[in-house]
């Protein structure tokens, strides 16, 4: 099974966070049994952007870009804190592409998290003393019991972003709210709450689980802010035992994404328009079209659309 780790927005850096032992333990443990996919969201870490956008739709667009680039129809998603919101956004809109959803210390609305008095005061500090802010928010989450890991997370935050980008993120996340999407999430969902994280809320996690149709809430244990060995075992059991929704497979061996491209093709859209609508690159569209032509026995766009019409893939 492929698992995509959807990162805590503006707080991930693939190289820097590897210095935190708990990150390595968590990642390597899952990678023993699964195809693990780690990434930095656009605008942070190793995915810099001159003009990053932090609305949920833009953040969620990273997920299909990864799946398409790796030729994956479907994957499980692990949403890490704020990363849970783009994960839920994608899962609600693309039920056929998400097999399981794991939410770690996540929430449904910015007001559930960003309005936390402790966080509010910490975010205010970011405008006046960036280094002190990074140290303080890491220490606030983990407590003084784990100062070495907190320093590692603070260094990761400084590597992940810069003050200008972080303040833009804080402004855009004010409108974050996936409440209306939760009922549309069809996959089995595991909502995990770590009581040692002082910036998370058990009440909000329970509300989240109650609003998702096929969700289970569990209190969990952690190591330096990440799931520890017992919780990793719990996640593994969930991925193994939870029944996933079944979806009819497209004809001709077409992937779900290729069907998406074919449907856009039937509207008369150009490659550039398809790329924009599906949030993928033009090169990815061209690659999908090549596969579509081979699988449908078509030599051009018109023949491919006729195939789709015969197979009732388009209206």
Language model features with spans:
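Short beta-strand/loop motif that positions the catalytic acidic residue
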Residues: 185, 191-193
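Conserved HGGG/HGGXW glycine-rich cap/lid loop of the alpha/beta-hydrolase fold
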Residues: 1-48
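Catalytic active-site module of serine/aspartate enzymes centered on a nucleophile-bearing elbow/loop
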Residues: 215-253
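Helix-turn-helix DNA-binding segment
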Residues: 247-290, 294-296, 303-306, 310-315
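Flexible "cap/lid" loop of the alpha/beta hydrolase fold
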Residues: 88, 92, 98-127
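Hydrophobic, aromatic-rich cap/lid helix
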Residues: 151-180, 184
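Conserved alpha/beta-hydrolase "acid-adjacent" motif
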Residues: 198-204
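Conserved acidic catalytic loop of the alpha/beta-hydrolase fold
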Residues: 57-75
